């Protein structure tokens, strides 16, 4: 029924032409074929500004270069963090990168973009151009790394208050063309390959990847698996999955999949960059050759090393270790250095070399992050396993209402590249349509299996518990998830909980439609008992896969922001209010987003089981 409704309300897809699309080898010989391509999509910077107050944002009265003589400032706006952050230069390029894999008549194309996100109209523009040459629409999975140092491709990061979108329509067309061309180039470069898969949990990469709450030594107490989770509960997705295809002439591609936000250069930057992802790819390409591609995993809630601590790694891969100075070697209270030669490495009681910590909000931090992921990927591949077929890929549509208050206010003024003129407004397909919900959009989830490797996709930033489940093997979690009195500053998972709420708020439902109740700050609270859905029998998404290796692909086929467990969604917050520990709720398309994703993947799983 859903498919019938969508057929009546969405633009129909073109029918693929007959034959082998794009020259992809669709032969039944048991051989894996792969090709890869990379296209530089760095925009030209013509108009720059003078940042008189050093806040990295254009304040309206600061001088600027009016290159086109229009009398208005028309920069490349950088996406991520706050609006009005112009690009004054390029630190490193941003890319569109593609991998095409085929075996025994089946094929798939995976595309990674160094963008904050890309709406489905541009992705489908590329898709339809490929379909015209025989490419099946369900075989194109396009994702954005969620880069916070790239150009705005959504619209929110220009001047939203002034009604000025942050995207350039010509650049948007360029991105669609780059997606198409990258797939064509990758298909044209396909050769037989041996495929290897590897994985590693970043929490297992040494004591400095975790804080004391999680058995490590990082100065950030709740650092876990190289992630500083900024939203309660502290649940992380720290699996790094790596795929590599090697042909007779050398490496064709190396693909990484991990959850960390490419945002660690922070907002105090006016140079375009692919953030840590670019460093990781450069290291892997120097190590192996070929083309490196990154696809994000469960990005949401908040998977990032930002505000954490990382061991310092230099551009050449040198790990910088702390040393003992003259004062330390003479200090009996300094157990690491007392009695050691001056200049010796600082080694703690467990025999671990103590690192120097990278400066936060710096390119050194970006480099350190990129090297950490690259080195883990290299080790994962060294211990990896071979991959053969079969290959199977499928997708499932769903309808998502846009109930976000700010999007319904800003959308009609043309701020977003995903325009309301493309929305579903027929009440049969979008029953939520009202004065507060101006429409719905069609979205898709994908399922891809290649031998022992399985991927599921979402069109946004998935909170990791929706993918991997809850840490119910930890007694601390069991207690804190059920009992709000166990939460607060001394808690491990729910440490931001306002103790003033414990006695005054009977249950979380009382806070879901308000910002505060008396002295209780509702924006510090999260659902109790904490759960993924109020729908019965809802398991984590990756439980649908029985492959040995499994992971999510986030930001795929469109971008509707955060996917949050519906019982934990605060419906009162918006971009026009305080957000507390519910920032993600202010930019998510809808409180029902997670349940719609869960439902769509359930339908997909049911179909695959038949």
PLM-predicted stretches and their roles:
Residues 14-143, 150-375, 381-610:
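Conserved beta-alpha junction segments in alpha/beta enzyme cores
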């Amino acid at each position: 029924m859903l498919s019938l409704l969508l057929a009546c309300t969405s633009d129909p897809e073109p029918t693929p032409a007959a034959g082998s699309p794009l020259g992809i080898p669709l032969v039944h010989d048991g051989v894996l074929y792969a090709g890869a391509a990379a296209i530089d999509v760095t925009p030209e910077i013509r108009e720059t500004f003078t940042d008189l107050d050093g806040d990295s944002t254009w304040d309206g009265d600061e001088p600027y270069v009016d290159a086109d003589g229009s009398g208005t400032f028309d920069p490349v706006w950088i996406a991520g963090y706050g609006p009005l952050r112009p690009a004054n230069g390029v630190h490193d390029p941003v890319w569109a990168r593609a991998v095409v894999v085929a075996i025994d008549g089946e094929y798939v194309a995976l595309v990674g973009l160094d963008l904050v996100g890309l709406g489905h109209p541009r992705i489908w523009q590329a898709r339809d151009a490929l379909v015209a040459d025989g490419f099946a629409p369900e075989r194109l999975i396009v994702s954005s790394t969620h880069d916070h140092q790239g150009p705005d491709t959504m619209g929110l990061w220009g001047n939203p208050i002034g009604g000025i979108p942050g995207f350039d329509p010509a650049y948007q067309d360029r991105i669609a063309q780059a997606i198409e061309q990258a797939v064509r180039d990758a298909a044209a470069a396909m050769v037989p390959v041996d495929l290897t898969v590897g994985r590693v949990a970043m929490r297992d990469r040494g004591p400095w990847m975790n804080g004391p709450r999680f058995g490590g030594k990082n100065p950030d107490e709740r650092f876990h698996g190289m992630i500083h989770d900024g939203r309660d509960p502290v649940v992380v997705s720290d699996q790094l999955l790596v795929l590599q295809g090697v042909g007779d002439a050398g490496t064709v591609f190396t693909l990484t999949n991990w959850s960390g936000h490419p945002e660690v250069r922070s907002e105090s930057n006016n140079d375009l960059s692919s953030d840590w992802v670019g460093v990781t790819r450069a290291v892997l390409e120097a190590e192996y050759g070929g083309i490196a591609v990154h696809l994000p995993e469960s990005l949401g809630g908040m998977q990032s090393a930002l505000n954490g601590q990382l061991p310092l790694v230099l551009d050449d891969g040198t790990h910088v270790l702390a040393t003992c100075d003259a004062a330390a070697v003479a200090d009996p209270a300094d157990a690491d250095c007392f009695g050691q030669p001056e200049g010796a490495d600082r080694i703690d009681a467990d025999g671990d070399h103590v690192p120097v910590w990278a400066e936060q909000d710096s390119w050194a931090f970006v480099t350190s992050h990129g090297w950490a992921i690259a080195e883990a990927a290299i080790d994962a591949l060294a211990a990896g396993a071979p991959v053969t077929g079969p290959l199977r890929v499928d997708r499932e549509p769903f309808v998502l209402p846009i109930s976000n208050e700010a999007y319904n206010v800003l959308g009609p003024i043309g701020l977003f590249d995903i325009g309301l003129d493309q929305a579903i407004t027929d009440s049969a397909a979008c029953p939520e349509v009202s004065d507060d919900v101006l429409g719905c959009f069609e979205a898709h989830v994908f399922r891809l299996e290649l031998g022992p490797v399985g991927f599921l996709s979402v069109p946004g930033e998935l909170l990791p518990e929706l993918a991997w489940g809850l840490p119910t093997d930890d007694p601390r979690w069991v207690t804190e998830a059920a009992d709000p009195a166990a939460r607060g500053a001394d808690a491990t998972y729910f440490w931001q909980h306002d103790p003033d709420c414990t006695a005054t708020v009977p249950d979380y439902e009382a806070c879901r439609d308000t910002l505060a109740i008396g002295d209780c700050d509702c924006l510090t609270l999260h659902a109790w008992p904490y759960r993924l859905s109020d729908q019965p029998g809802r398991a984590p998404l990756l439980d649908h896969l029985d492959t040995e290796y499994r992971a999510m692909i986030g930001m795929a086929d469109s971008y509707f922001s955060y996917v949050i467990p519906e019982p934990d969604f605060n419906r009162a917050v918006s971009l026009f209010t305080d957000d507390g520990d519910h920032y993600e709720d202010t930019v998510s398309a809808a409180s029902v987003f997670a349940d719609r994703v869960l439902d769509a993947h359930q339908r997909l799983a049911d179909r695959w089981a038949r």
